[in-house]
UniProtKB/Swiss-Prot annotation:
Residues forming coiled coils: none
Catalysed reactions, as listed in the record: dUMP + (6R)-5,10-methylene-5,6,7,8-tetrahydrofolate + NADPH + H(+) = dTMP + (6S)-5,6,7,8-tetrahydrofolate + NADP(+)
Full protein name: Flavin-dependent thymidylate synthase
EC number per UniProt: 2.1.1.148
Record flagged with keyword Flavoprotein: yes
Functional summary from the UniProt entry: Catalyzes the reductive methylation of 2'-deoxyuridine-5'-monophosphate (dUMP) to 2'-deoxythymidine-5'-monophosphate (dTMP) while utilizing 5,10-methylenetetrahydrofolate (mTHF) as the methyl donor, and NADPH and FADH(2) as the reductant.
Stored Gene3D superfamilies: 3.30.1360.170
This protein's encoding gene: thyX
The ThyX domain, residue ranges: 12-267
GO terms for MF: flavin adenine dinucleotide binding; NADPH binding; thymidylate synthase (FAD) activity; thymidylate synthase activity
Residues reported to bind dUMP: 86-89, 97-101, 205, 233
InterPro entries (UniProt xref): Thymidylate_synthase_ThyX, Thymidylate_synthase_ThyX_sf
Organism this protein belongs to: Aeropyrum pernix (strain ATCC 700893 / DSM 11879 / JCM 9820 / NBRC 100138 / K1)
GO BP, sorted A to Z: dTMP biosynthetic process; dTTP biosynthetic process; methylation
Family label: Belongs to the thymidylate synthase ThyX family.
Amino acid sequence: MAASLEKAGLGISVRLLEYTGDGERIVAVASKVSLSRSPAERLLAIGEDEVETWILETFRRQHFSPWEHSVYTFMVEGLSRVASHQLVRHRVASYTQLSHRYSEGYLREAALKACESIGLDCPSKPAETEGGRKAAYRLYSQALERAARDFGASERFAIAAKAFVIPPTILARGDGGDGVVEAYLRSAAIYYSLLSRGARREDARYILPDALRTRIVVTMNARELIQVFFPLRMCTRAQWEIRHIAWLLWRELSRVHPRLFRWAGPSCVLRENTLRTTPASLYSYLEGVERFTQPRCPELVENKAIPGCLRQAASVAPPGDGEYE
């Protein structure tokens, strides 16, 4: 799977935009607040060793309410609307998504790539006048239709990937996706044809598949991430694209707040770590340094099969050697 994803060039990225800079300390301070009678000055003067201790204690006791005070805002770019629909099901979060009605930026990238490939002089931005816009849309439609009809599989893929996420299993067929990539291009051609004939964008978009790329800004807190999002979405049971996103996000968060996210992972890892006196890093499970003791994971995978299942889950975005120990 990892090789096919790399070959596909998914074009999906996760970028951390903002976060609670001293989030680890704030989690520890909030944990002390719930138990200590000390004044605020003493609580805020917590040392690094105490930060480590309080984070560990809240994790072991599954007392995650203090973790809600560490918040993360990130942008996912290039994901499909299939994946974005799964993402927004996580309700303890805030979302702002690229408008499907007012923006056709990803589609235009594909159209311009098609224009370039066939040597058609197309405007990079349609003119402001109605006639100018319709003329540009006609050219986009013609270029995309020709690409769908006349180009080989690799050329079609290079154009379609600008606007659509193409599943690796489809690419692995070796026949250009058995007409799928061609269908993507034809849908984009029809979309621009409709616009050139005066259709509204809000209506023309009905022809487009859910594979269309989008962009979304998400804000979540550490508790939602470690208790809900990562256990569900880093697991092999998750659909491959959102699993890819979850592992990319985990890598980003592990860099800025390793003491909070080193024990995070799919549901098998979260369960194992909450059973242990001392939790272990996700990397140590991946490398087989630590072994699972649970008879089966929450997804009913038997004990002996859990390590392989975890490695399969990580194959969409594996960490480097020694990363996040």
